């Protein structure tokens, strides 16, 4: 059964008015909120009532969702176009039950690889790993892009209060040399360890940055042997790693059943462990595992990722929402939106179903946002008075790591005020009367009132964490991961491939050849616009 069928459109005819719904039901918050350990999920400010929620849940029950959940956790190859299992959950699974993929118990492999990463981290942190000149490592530079960068960078920043080593961790991703130079300007070649994170060891941006970092190192040492002391790799291409000069003992695994955007739980999370220590990294995994169990074992009506996905899919199918705002009210989560943009949009930005047929309904949306209260002085105007339908997720942390309680109270007050303003708004009469009370005459009040009306009745969800710890952050990330999965099932699309990014890579290589040789076939096959752009660049 398709989730986006005509029946969903009729639900809109319920004409939900949030103010009225709250006025007539003093148990609305109790009914439309859930709790998982230290995470409180309030979805009462959404455009639903008992009937709508019941209808959405019935659709989920009639779908293949239950079977798909079992298939994913059991290692079925649900990534059908690449014939791969989807098992990032296995990386944080604390059980000992065997899980066989292609004839191998991957639990044993995962345990072995975790131990290798732990030993490396402890060796570097303790000072037993030394640079080529014998000095202790002080800086880690992670070179990767996409999932090899966004997830670890987000977590390292979010958990800054938990940094417990003397290591400074830097991230390099963009092929623009400025990205690399920002890191190289603040590190010492004698005390820096580079992590090259690339499954194929051929990702253009990562490889180019790695080669330049290697040249920088050798400009200092003038000895190829130094590479082994200052580089480790996370890759499945051992021959390329060895050719680069990295000791294969320090090449860490990436499995085909872990997608890049879900890989921070794997060896890709090494940079996280260097910052917060391996014990805290394990707590991050444990938090995610707690949500995995919640997702697997909880009935849909009390299942947070399922409710998240049902609401988002409902708005997409029924209200034609093309955008989702994500507003974390905590500066530590400043990279959370960037991280989820990739996780969500690369997963569900599809236009054909599992069978390869073009779908006639909307799937993925544009996920965007920023940290509060910055957004209030930037784009919240559009949320409150624009005429685009944009559901909002607020993320708030009840307690902070610092002692500036007045700052924390102001931050939370602003967060809750924004969700309340989206819900209630302010009517023309309210504004008009306030303007009269402020001293304006009737003519002036009438002229200004229409400009100050805020329609309200705009849906939002608030996710409140007790604290932002490794455990709770792991849980938060897993909630969104499973939401993405559920939406893919409801829309009957493959959330785990990303063929849309391949064409640009291919054309980029062709254009690079064309830029270097205007007699090449690649140049001759260019369109006039691209040829003219190249000419403009060459003329400078």
UniProtKB/Swiss-Prot annotation:
EC number, UniProt record: 5.3.1.9
Signal peptide per UniProt: none
InterPro entries cross-referenced by the UniProt entry: G6P_Isomerase, G6P_Isomerase_C, Phosphoglucose_isomerase_CS, SIS_dom_sf, SIS_PGI_1, SIS_PGI_2
Intracellular or extracellular location(s): Cytoplasm
Catalytic residues (UniProt): 346 (proton donor), 377, 505
One BP term from GO: gluconeogenesis
Primary location group: cytoplasm
Pathway(s) it belongs to: Carbohydrate biosynthesis; gluconeogenesis; Carbohydrate degradation; glycolysis; D-glyceraldehyde 3-phosphate and glycerone phosphate from D-glucose: step 2/4
GO MF term set: carbohydrate derivative binding; glucose-6-phosphate isomerase activity; monosaccharide binding
Enzymatic reactions: alpha-D-glucose 6-phosphate = beta-D-fructose 6-phosphate
Entry's family note: Belongs to the GPI family.
NCBIfam families: PRK00179.1 (NF001211)
Name of the protein described by the UniProt record: Glucose-6-phosphate isomerase
Organism in which the protein naturally occurs: Francisella tularensis subsp. novicida (strain U112)
